[in-house]
């Protein structure tokens, strides 16, 4: 259960970073 949650969080973070790099705008 925790492993799935961690994987999900990692996926979201990775996709968020990709969007940040793609749009050249990073909220973080």
From Swiss-Prot:
Tissue specificity, in the record's words, reads:
Highly expressed in the tentacles. Weakly expressed in acrorhagi and mesenteric filaments.
Function comment: Probable toxin expected to be employed in prey capture and/or defense against predators (based on its abundance in tentacles). Has only a weak affinity for lipid membranes. Shows moderate cytotoxic activity against breast cancer cell lines (MCF-7 and MDA-MB-231).
* Localization, UniProt: Secreted; Nematocyst
Q: Which of UniProt's keywords are assigned here?
A: Disulfide bond, Nematocyst, Secreted, Signal, Toxin
GO cellular component terms?
extracellular region; nematocyst
Q: What is its main location?
A: secreted
Cite the source lineage.
Eukaryota, Metazoa, Cnidaria, Anthozoa, Hexacorallia
Quaternary structure (record):
Monomer in solution.
Q: Name one GO molecular function term.
A: toxin activity
Where does the signal peptide begin and end?
1-15
Miscellaneous = The 26-Cys-Pro-27 bond exists only in the trans-isomerization.
Record note on modification: May be N-glycosylated at Asn-22. Activity with this modification has not be tested.
The molecule here is called: U-actitoxin-Ate1
Q: Which cysteines are joined by disulfide bonds?
A: 20-26
Which domain of life does this protein belong to? Eukaryota
């Amino acid at each position: 259960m925790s492993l799935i949650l961690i994987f999900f969080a990692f996926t979201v973070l990775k996709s968020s970073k990709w969007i940040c790099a793609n749009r050249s705008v990073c909220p973080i």
